C-alpha cells in the first residue's frame, strides 16, 4: 500500500498553508493502550504539533494531543506527552541533515490507521513567508472563480 493510504483519523490542513512540503515520510507511532483507543475514536489533534530529532537520534512527535480515553481508569495516559516515531535509520540520518538547514521543519500531515497500526505522515517543510501565503490565497480564489464561471456557463 502506498504511503499515506488508510483510514484517515486526523489531517493537518494548516501545514500546507504554512509550509512548502518537499518530501513526506511514513512513520509508526509508539503508543500506550488507551492512546490507540482514543485515536480509533478520532479524538486526536495534530494542528499545533511538530516532530524533532533528539540527541540520541530518535524522532519525537511533540505537542500531539490525544484525548484521554473515556473508559480508561487511573492508568490513562498524559494527553500531550512526546511520542517516539518509528523510522528506518537511513531515513533518520537523511532527516538530520535536512532539518539542520535554515527554515526546514518536520510537520505531521495526517494520522491514519493502516493494517490496524496507527501511522503518521510527516512532511519535510520549508516555512512560507507572508507574501507566499497571500499569493497562494490569491491563486486559490482565482481557481474558485474560474470553476464557478465554468459551472455557471454549463447550465
From Swiss-Prot:
It is found in: Cytoplasm. Transmembrane segments: none annotated. InterPro entries: SmpB (IPR023620), SsrA-bd_prot (IPR000037), SsrA-bd_prot_CS (IPR020081). Keywords: Cytoplasm, RNA-binding. GO terms for biological process: trans-translation. One of its GO terms (cellular component) is cytosol. The keyword Cytoplasm applies. One of its GO terms (molecular function) is RNA binding. It comes from the Bacteria. The keyword RNA-binding applies. Residues 132-155 are annotated as: Disordered. Belongs to the SmpB family. Required for rescue of stalled ribosomes mediated by trans-translation. Binds to transfer-messenger RNA (tmRNA), required for stable association of tmRNA with ribosomes. tmRNA and SmpB together mimic tRNA shape, replacing the anticodon stem-loop with SmpB. tmRNA is encoded by the ssrA gene; the 2 termini fold to resemble tRNA(Ala) and it encodes a 'tag peptide', a short internal open reading frame. During trans-translation Ala-aminoacylated tmRNA acts like a tRNA, entering the A-site of stalled ribosomes, displacing the stalled mRNA. This is SsrA-binding protein. It comes from Oceanobacillus iheyensis (strain DSM 14371 / CIP 107618 / JCM 11309 / KCTC 3954 / HTE831).
Amino acid at each position: 500500500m502506498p504511503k499515506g493510504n488508510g483510514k484517515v483519523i486526523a489531517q493537518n490542513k494548516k501545514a500546507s498553508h504554512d509550509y512548502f512540503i518537499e518530501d513526506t515520510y511514513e512513520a509508526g507511532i509508539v503508543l500506550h493502550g488507551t492512546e490507540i483507543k482514543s485515536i480509533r475514536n478520532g479524538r486526536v489533534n495534530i494542528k499545533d504539533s511538530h516532530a524533532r530529532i533528539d540527541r540520541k537520534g530518535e524522532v519525537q512527535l511533540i505537542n500531539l494531543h490525544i484525548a484521554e480515553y473515556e473508559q480508561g481508569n487511573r492508568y490513562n495516559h498524559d494527553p500531550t506527552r512526546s511520542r517516539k516515531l518509528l523510522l528506518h535509520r537511513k531515513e533518520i540520518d537523511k532527516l538530520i541533515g535536512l532539518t539542520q538547514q535554515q527554515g526546514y521543519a518536520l510537520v505531521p500531515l495526517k494520522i491514519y490507521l493502516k493494517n490496524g497500526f496507527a501511522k503518521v505522515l510527516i512532511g519535510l517543510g520549508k516555512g512560507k513567508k507572508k507574501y507566499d501565503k497571500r499569493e497562494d490565497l490569491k491563486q486559490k480564489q482565482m481557481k474558485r472563480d474560474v470553476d464557478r464561471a465554468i459551472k455557471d456557463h454549463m447550465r
